[in-house]
Amino acid sequence: MDAAAFVNSVISRPWQADGLHCWELTRLCQREVFGRDLPAVLVAPESLLAKVRLMRRRHDFEGWTVSNRPCHGAVCFLTRKGHGDADAACHSGTWLALDGPGALLHVDHPQGVAFESLAELKLRNWSEPSFHIPIR
């Protein structure tokens, strides 16, 4: 599916702990737009500590390379300001090079699915983005 069409098909959908949470949207975008399969997480962890522990497992996944800048199709991990460095990531999305330099397609509560620039994410207290390019 075309990236713009995918964004239009999911934008504003609500966040759901047992449905469309941030990792599930990331997986869905990677599969539908790029034909890549990423590991499943059936239910979003409730506590911040559990989310951080789960996201830390990304370092064990050999299916991607790390990029120092955003690029089309990269999985982006984020943390909240004050919660440590990128190793304490608790959120994910997919960077899509649409509308100029691009933006992150992600979903959180209570906002729902959004397509936001790094500046917009920073205003919403998301920080320390790290970009991982799936190679499989």
Regions found by a protein language model. Name each.
Residues 14, 19, 42, 59, ...:
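Solvent-exposed, flexible loop/coil residues
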Residues 8-12, 78-81:
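A broad detector of the eukaryotic-type serine/threonine protein kinase catalytic domain
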Residues 1-11, 114-136:
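Non-catalytic ligand/cofactor/substrate-binding and regulatory segments of enzyme domains
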Residues 43-113:
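...with weaker cross-activation on analogous glycine-rich loops/strands in unrelated enzymes
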Residues 29-34, 49-57, 128:
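Short amphipathic alpha-helical patches
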Residues 36-41:
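Glycine-rich phosphate/pyrophosphate-binding loops
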Residues 14-34:
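Active-site nucleophilic cysteine motif
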